[in-house]
């Protein structure tokens, strides 16, 4: 049976759920798909059950595995690709590696428990990796006391304000993912209200459609008889079947012979789309996660760059001791993981909680440009987050 082609009828956004473990992120994600799937005869959304999201296959990301579930759904005005990361470690790794470039996020907070350590950590991480818009779902509101829920809402707004999200303006919607899954009309309506808030509060991002095509490689697959496929989110520009592209890091120039999103063929992919690209005549072992597929000649790989970096405090899960010149951590840039030497120049020491300027010399060439965000990792934890200010 031939596959149905992907038809772009609505603007596309990438969204994700975040929040403390057991506050109901996965249940709410399942409820969103169920409510939208049952909206009427014209619904294009398919219901995805809790178990299917919760048992999402592991995705290998440079030596670390991430459990991440991808679902898609449509509201009246938009098409969403939604990621749910069931475990806390999965969320941290995902945000740090940029495996999911989110245009906005739904922060799920239990009305019974309020803010927990992971709630605050997820908000901090979202801010660092450039998620500019958050909508709050106060979950389990069916079981909570109204006065207590009011207090939790106040707490959440204060937390968001502290991290630069303008907590007073952020939509906070009281929901019950569980009751919505059970079909309770009141709580089904609450999920619809949440989606309305996402539709109206999270703006359409600038997608850089006019810029040269660039896609950071997240995964590489082989389709028997057809060739090598790379998957990832298009960072900027557009790509069509037949376009010439180069794989930076593999020094290969080739042609895109196939294009799919969520298993549906498409003629053209644009910035923000999650896609699979079939590349002509490229051997499976020449391409790997961390490389970049781009319009030929549009990006020059480099090793040295200057950056502004925030060093996480011990309270945020970072180091308890300062960094000095000569420090050699792992740099997570787009989907690449590269060791690098740090030179702090005149600053000499960077204490946990400081924001500093540093020069970095990477162990190998990586496509770099001003404004690119990255994370610094050491011993399996994030110790810093920064932005490239100059490429040398």
From Swiss-Prot:
GO cellular component terms, A-Z: cytoplasm
The keyword Transmembrane is annotated on this UniProt entry: no
EC class name: hydrolase
Residue positions binding GTP: 19-26, 84-88, 139-142
Annotated spans, G2: 63-67
Disulphide bond pairs: none
Reaction catalysed by this enzyme: GTP + H2O = GDP + phosphate + H(+)
Signal peptide region: none
Region (G5), start-end ranges: 176-178
UniProt xrefs under CDD domains: EF_Tu, EFTU_II, EFTU_III
Function, as annotated: GTP hydrolase that promotes the GTP-dependent binding of aminoacyl-tRNA to the A-site of ribosomes during protein biosynthesis.
Protein name listed in UniProt: Elongation factor Tu-3
Source organism of the structure: Streptomyces coelicolor (strain ATCC BAA-471 / A3(2) / M145)
